[in-house]
């Protein structure tokens, strides 16, 4: 009986570990953990119609400042 419980415990641990490793949680890219920056980068991506603009805006400050300039004009 104890061996079955040990096997089940090990299987549960393996499944839990794999679930955390292959989780599909949408984590913010780069500096887009900040809500304001995230919203601005999304707006700039929509306006620019460039697929990778959001990622660039979240990672690079220069692209973020270009985004701010785009929204000012």
Swiss-Prot record:
What are the GO cellular component annotations? extracellular region
Location(s) in or outside the cell: Secreted
Molecular function terms from GO = potassium channel regulator activity; toxin activity
Where, by residue number, does the polypeptide cross the bilayer?
none
Instruction: Classify the source by domain of life.
Output: Eukaryota
* Main localisation: secreted
State the UniProt keywords alphabetically: Disulfide bond, Ion channel impairing toxin, Neurotoxin, Potassium channel impairing toxin, Secreted, Signal, Toxin, Voltage-gated potassium channel impairing toxin
Q: Which residues form the signal peptide?
A: 1-23
Question: What disulfide bonds does the UniProt entry report for this chain?
Answer: 32-58, 41-57, 44-67
How would you summarize where this protein is expressed among tissues? Answer: Expressed by the venom gland.
Similarity section: Belongs to the scoloptoxin family.
Please describe what this protein does.
Inhibits voltage-gated potassium channels.
State the protein's name: Kappa-scoloptoxin(03)-Ssm1c
